[in-house]
Amino acid sequence: MALNKNHSEGGGVIVNNTESILMSYDHVELTFNDMKNVPEAFKGTKKGTVYLTPYRVIFLSKGKDAMQSFMMPFYLMKDCEIKQPVFGANFIKGIVKAEAGGGWEGSASYKLTFTAGGAIEFGQRMLQVASQASRGEVPNGAYGYPYMPSGAYVFPPPVANGMYPCPPGYPYPPPPPEFYPGPPMMDGAMGYVQPPPPPYPGPMEPPVSGPSAPATPAAEAKAAEAAASAYYNPGNPHNVYMPTSQPPPPPYYPPEDKKTQ
């Protein structure tokens, strides 16, 4: 969290050279509480614009306030909540910790009140982007605003490896690399690689059979009887189990006439 290091002399917002503005809202009020030694810049209510980038929240004050800009990186924020009171405007609150060389020390409770609306939209997007940043993902639309019409400006997109070096003269060091690691390597070590499918056996060859004999009514009846007694397994539809062939019945001899016996 840095104090007065993200604004230009012309009143624009300065973001890192690999970041861009994902979302912004005007008519926002910023207040601080729970500080042991309150610096002059943290006293009172600050009015201005809040900006969301892929890795931090930046508040830009209007007028000649002692706090011209205030930056909160996600990895130093905790206990963030979106509140919808019955009376009054919706707001976002949480706790932020100072970073080394940020212009102040300790921690503080902050409250961002959206007097003209937008707290829910901004808060939900902030939580989503913070979660993506913690996993090393690039948020959707991270490079959507190359220039802000209000005079604010952003720097070019990030380099190929996803990490962002500071531009010349940037007033504070980048966060430790463990907070925003690059995208994970997609190799076998991930544990989610599916095994290759089994080899395709190819089309089934027709069975080899001898020369077909002319069909007769007796042969067709016997084949129909064998098919009726076959067993079909739905789990193995390519095989049909046939009963073992039985010997033919003995020939039929009509009984002799008793008169001839």
From Swiss-Prot:
Motif (PPxY motif 2): 248-252
Effect of residue 170 to A: No effect on interaction with NEDD4
Effect of residue 200 to A: Abolishes interaction with NEDD4
Protein's recorded name: WW domain-binding protein 2
Region ranges (Disordered): 196-261
Main location: cytoplasm
InterPro entries named in the record: GRAM, WBP2-like
Biased composition (Low complexity): 210-230
Job description of the protein: Acts as a transcriptional coactivator of estrogen and progesterone receptors (ESR1 and PGR) upon hormone activation. In presence of estrogen, binds to ESR1-responsive promoters. Synergizes with YAP1 to enhance PGR activity. Modulates expression of post-synaptic scaffolding proteins via regulation of ESR1, ESR2 and PGR.
Domain GRAM positions: 1-84
Pfam families: GRAM
Record note on domains: The PPxY motif 1 mediates interaction with NEDD4. The PPxY motif 2 is required for the coactivation function.
UniProt-listed GO biological process terms: cellular response to estrogen stimulus; establishment of protein localization to chromatin; positive regulation of intracellular estrogen receptor signaling pathway; positive regulation of transcription by RNA polymerase II; progesterone receptor signaling pathway; response to estrogen; response to progesterone; transcription initiation-coupled chromatin remodeling
Organism: Mus musculus
Residues modified to Phosphotyrosine: 192, 231
This protein's UniProt keywords: Cytoplasm, Nucleus, Phosphoprotein, Repeat
Compartments in which it is found: Cytoplasm; Nucleus
Ranges annotated as spanning the membrane: none
